[in-house]
Amino acid sequence: MSERTVLIAGASGVIGQSAVQRFAAAGWRVIAVSRRAPDVSADTPFQHLPLDLLDSARCRAAAGEFGGVTHVVYAALYEKPGLYAGWFEQDQMDTNLTMMRNLMEPLIAAATGLRHVSVFQGTKAYGAHVHQIAVPARERSARDPHANFYWLQEDFLRERRARADWSLTIWRPQVVFGGATGVAMNIVPVIGAYAAIQRELGQPLIYPGRPGGVAEAVDADLIADALLWAGEAEAARDETFNITNGDVFTWADTWPAIASALNMEPAFGEPFSLVDYLRQHEGVWDDLVRRQGLRATPLPELLGESHHYADLLFGVNAPADAARAPVLVSTIKLRQAGFGECIDTEEMFAKWLWRLAERKVIPAA
């Protein structure tokens, strides 16, 4: 078999970082496209291409690096500060399409051996952020009639796909958890930083949210394994797949396991905003980072926009009597296609928190 070269766009993000690690471990040549280098283990071989995808001239100039690319994982994402409001704003949608065009147009022209492209959507494809959705949401449902950059990107890729030999796989993951820091939507470092501050203050790990309903999660490493599978699987050609860990959870029921992974006592009280809490305790964080010899990462740099995402997931700003159907998806299609990997969600949280501690991002438990 000829050399397999994967270009991973958004390589420093929660999905991209796991993909870099997994593809490299499987023997692929990896080109990591991101402004920041992915924070992976030191022995992971990859070529970092520090591109700003909003710089079309720079993307065109990099075309010489794209010739040998056989696979693309497009996991790049633009989010506005504060996160949620931007999901409804046309300029944010247009920016995400522009980023994809700037990279993919010169890449498709240069990569004559391109075989497969994976791209990410999510449960917002079903309208989960604007209305109740069917339980479970299935890939065969009609396109939900709301404005979304997912549709702009999908239509762009399908139009290019119609004139080419490569195939396309669209992924709709549930809430993704992984090891990336400073990103828009990964609350693992948010929980880790909050827990470290609470321990520093001699307090238990108080659950900050409302009781909430049944939810699903997906491990970034599991997604990376699915990307590896899809890159070679005939059953993944030109298909759309939901993907989850395989179980369900509630935040309140999972909180004791999260506390245990951090060697802390769980506690429950009234909901409060982690955005506000973390802003108020930046000085405590700075002090414990210095004293415990952690990476010198200011709290805003560690969190990105993910503390806003945490408030959303924990239902902090939801009305106390809010009653909505759970956002659950079917993964039958993916399993029937041949990918059946799963992980216990409580074990997933423990794994990622421990890894952050190993990297000295948060204190050891």
Residue ranges and their predicted role:
Residues 9, 178, 207-213, 241-248, ...:
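Glycine-rich Rossmann NAD(P)(H)-binding loop
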Residues 226-318, 322, 330-332, 336, ...:
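Mid/C-terminal beta-alpha module of Rossmann-like enzyme folds, strongest
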Residues 121, 156-185:
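Conserved beta-loop-beta element that borders a ligand/cofactor-binding pocket
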Residues 38-42, 46-98:
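NAD(P)H-binding glycine-rich loop region in Rossmannoid oxidoreductase-like domains
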Residues 4-26:
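N-terminal Rossmann NAD(P)H-binding glycine-rich loop of SDR-like oxidoreductase domains
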Residues 164, 176-193, 229-241, 265:
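Glycine/proline-rich active-site loop of Rossmann-fold NAD(P)-dependent oxidoreductases
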Residues 73-74, 84-149:
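Conserved Rossmann-fold NAD(P)-dependent oxidoreductase catalytic core, especially the SDR/UDP-sugar
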